[in-house]
């Protein structure tokens, strides 16, 4: 049985197939998961993730069950593996938005239903699928290659995009502050994948260097959930990494900006640049619905083969 915990577990062909199927489902909705059930476990609050998953399973003909931390005996000390065994035996899919990736891995180890990573501190793979669909729609993949820059924190979005770019053979540049680094194990994996795919990946501390000649610019919030006590320090460390008019002028003339939201204007992106690219950004958010539909169908098909 296949889970969706990180894009590392998926081939180039599988990733592109998910994006293409999402595009088809966007054009022609189908009830492909009649009477299937999705359990949604949230340790972290969400707007877009809950909307995307709940609507996806509903529009596919299934049902969603929302479970917060307070709804589960996990909050009272029940082992993760026991909760996984119970929920996994009752539903068809489990979506988890968690604080610790290790809990996600343990849940998947014991669940009889496929587990989907809807966000952990290490990865945010469903968001990257939505980004890829958006890039496809804006014709930013030419001859199988997209030229992408990620500017900001070396967080779960950066990790997931690094992996995707390495597998897909993209040109991908990262710019982060000097006292930040990419997870070494994830970086090593990406470098090995790049040798296979032909991806061109670079890392610097200069946003202008990373942005040069890029068609897609990606940024994210500097202060993730749970880091509120670090806000003042991080804002100071990241102040040179805002995406503003000067920054976008270094990218290609028709470059698009992506942001997984929520966006904090005046910090990671200027108000002017955000509004200039708002149509793309909010379509990016909407596209989460369609990639989740494709993902659920994929996992259902994989499970049916066993």
UniProtKB/Swiss-Prot annotation:
It comes from the Bacteria. It is found in: Cytoplasm. It holds the Pfam family OTCace_N. One of its GO terms (cellular component) is cytoplasm. L-ornithine binds at residues 156, 220, 224-225. Carbamoyl phosphate binds at residues 46-49, 73, 97, 124-127, 260-261, 288. The keyword tRNA-binding does not apply. Keywords: Arginine metabolism, Cytoplasm, Transferase. Its main location: cytoplasm. It catalyses: carbamoyl phosphate + L-ornithine = L-citrulline + phosphate + H(+). PROSITE patterns: CARBAMOYLTRANSFERASE. Belongs to the aspartate/ornithine carbamoyltransferase superfamily. OTCase family. HAMAP family: OTCase. Reversibly catalyzes the transfer of the carbamoyl group from carbamoyl phosphate (CP) to the N(epsilon) atom of ornithine (ORN) to produce L-citrulline. NCBIfam families: orni_carb_tr, PRK00779.1. This is Ornithine carbamoyltransferase. It comes from Campylobacter jejuni subsp. doylei (strain ATCC BAA-1458 / RM4099 / 269.97).
């Amino acid at each position: 049985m296949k889970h969706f915990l990180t894009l590392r577990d998926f081939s180039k062909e599988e990733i592109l197939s998910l994006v293409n199927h999402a595009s088809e489902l966007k054009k022609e909705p189908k009830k492909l998961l009649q009477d299937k059930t999705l359990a949604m476990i949230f340790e972290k609050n969400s707007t877009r993730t809950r909307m995307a998953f709940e609507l996806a399973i509903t529009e596919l003909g299934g049902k969603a069950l929302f479970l917060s931390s307070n709804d589960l005996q996990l909050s009272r000390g029940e082992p993760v593996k026991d909760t996984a065994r119970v929920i996994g035996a009752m539903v068809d899919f489990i979506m988890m938005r968690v604080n610790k990736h290790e809990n996600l891995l343990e849940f998947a180890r014991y669940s009889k239903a496929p587990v989907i990573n809807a966000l952990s501190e290490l990865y945010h793979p469903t968001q990257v699928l939505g980004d890829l669909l958006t890039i496809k729609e804006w014709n930013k993949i030419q001859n199988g290659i997209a030229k992408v820059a990620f500017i900001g924190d070396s967080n779960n979005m950066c990790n997931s995009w690094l992996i995707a770019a390495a597998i897909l053979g993209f040109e991908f540049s990262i710019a982060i502050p000097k006292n930040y680094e990419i997870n070494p194990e994830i970086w090593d994996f990406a470098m090995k994948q790049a040798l296979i795919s032909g991806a061109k990946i670079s890392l610097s501390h200069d946003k202008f260097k990373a942005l040069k000649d890029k068609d897609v610019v990606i940024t994210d919030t500097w202060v993730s959930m749970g880091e509120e006590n670090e806000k003042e320090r991080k804002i100071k460390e990241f102040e040179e990494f805002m995406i503003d008019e000067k920054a976008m002028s270094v990218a290609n003339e028709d470059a698009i900006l992506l942001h997984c939201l929520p966006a904090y204007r005046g910090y990671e992106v200027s108000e002017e640049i955000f509004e200039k690219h708002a149509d793309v950004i909010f379509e990016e958010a909407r596209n989460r619905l369609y990639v989740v539909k494709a993902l659920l169908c994929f996992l259902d098909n994989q499970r049916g083969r066993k």
